Amino acid sequence: MRTDDFDYKLPEELIASYPLENRDASRLLKLNKQTGEILDHKFTDFIDFINPEDLLIFNNSKVMLARLYGEKITGAKLEYLIERVKTPKIFETHIKANRSPAIGSEIYVQDTLAKILEKDGGMYLLELQGNKDIYQLMEEFGHIPLPPYMKRDDEEFDAERYQTVYAKDLGSVAAPTAGLHFSEELMQQIKAKGTDIAYITLHVGSGTFKPVQVDDVNNHKMHSEVISVSEDVCEKIRQTKANGGRVIAIGTTSVRSLETAGQSGEIQPYQGETDIFLYPGKKFNIVDAMITNFHLPKSTLIMLVSAFADKEKIMKAYEHAIAEKYRFFSYGDAMFIF
């Protein structure tokens, strides 16, 4: 299977660089994965597509203010993208610099000195030397790390709009974007309908934006992310399945978490790393339907939805979305695949 099979041409004006005024004002393309039928809806119509016996699974990870700035002792400018916090003083980060800083050297992260402990590929391990920890630095100086395709600096509203309304556990470098469409009001409507809700956690890494760089999909090495699926969530899933309801994953991060926890065929609690790569030919054991945004060409995420719904049906849905001028990517519109 070729990576080029998952390419498509997207007019640049369809990339959503800004969110709509209201979260739930986006559009929703409804795709029947059995028949291939495509229907155009408003996102608020989603309430009509779910039943009381269904279970919605959301990713409650919160985006870190992960973009920071600093300099070398020489004064040369540095830009950081914090990838993962190991302890309050030790963290993994990408560093953008004219010349890569050396292992063992000291550099400034904002106003605080840090030592470079290790380097692995493009990832550095830093230890802060001052009184402040990385959480304090992010809180004081940090910027929302908008995806590169938005081609703009973050603005004040992004701190709210690039987070889901239910975000709780700090740790992501990118938003679990399918959840951005859910307003407080829509969450209340779901509860009022009697549809149950559960939360998993997957801390999204910057690898989510990385295009697949090998020609053969089978040779792609997936990046690793930290997930948590509790026994309470597993029990809700078992009950939902037993009662004939559907497990509806909100976003590909929820899909990957649930399918990691369900790799044996049965859902089990899971805490740790996942590098699960779902592409056509892979089986889904847990998820029955999903909400997801429109994904970048040749990305692992367009491969995931193609595995779930059949590649030809997905590509036809994307063609339809482009023709109908849907908005694409993180701040864009969504699909309901069932």
Swiss-Prot record:
Spans through the membrane: none
GO MF annotations in UniProt: S-adenosylmethionine:tRNA ribosyltransferase-isomerase activity
Gene3D superfamilies in the record: QueA-like
Keywords: Cytoplasm, Queuosine biosynthesis, S-adenosyl-L-methionine, Transferase
Enzyme Commission identifier(s): 2.4.99.17
Organism domain of life: Bacteria
Cellular localization per UniProt: Cytoplasm
Pathway in which this enzyme or protein is active: tRNA modification; tRNA-queuosine biosynthesis
Disulfide bonds: none
GO (cellular component) term, any one: cytoplasm
Catalysed reaction, written as an equation: 7-aminomethyl-7-carbaguanosine(34) in tRNA + S-adenosyl-L-methionine = epoxyqueuosine(34) in tRNA + adenine + L-methionine + 2 H(+)
Cited Pfam families: Queuosine_synth
Listed GO biological process terms: queuosine biosynthetic process; tRNA wobble guanine modification
Subunit organization: Monomer.
Function in brief: Transfers and isomerizes the ribose moiety from AdoMet to the 7-aminomethyl group of 7-deazaguanine (preQ1-tRNA) to give epoxyqueuosine (oQ-tRNA).
NCBIfam families (alphabetical): PRK00147.1, queA
Family: Belongs to the QueA family.
Protein name as it appears in the record: S-adenosylmethionine:tRNA ribosyltransferase-isomerase
Organism name: Francisella philomiragia subsp. philomiragia (strain ATCC 25017 / CCUG 19701 / FSC 153 / O#319-036)
